């Protein structure tokens, strides 16, 4: 008799954060940071 494979209770949460269709984590972070940088950069002296 085989025991049913136990699922990690956090697997769905981890899959949400590690969704391959969403691109790499770095790409996701860049998407979040770029709009913020667009607002901050014009105020910095060039």
Swiss-Prot record:
Additional observations: Completely overlaps the 35S rRNA gene.
Protein name stated in the entry: Putative uncharacterized protein YLR154W-F
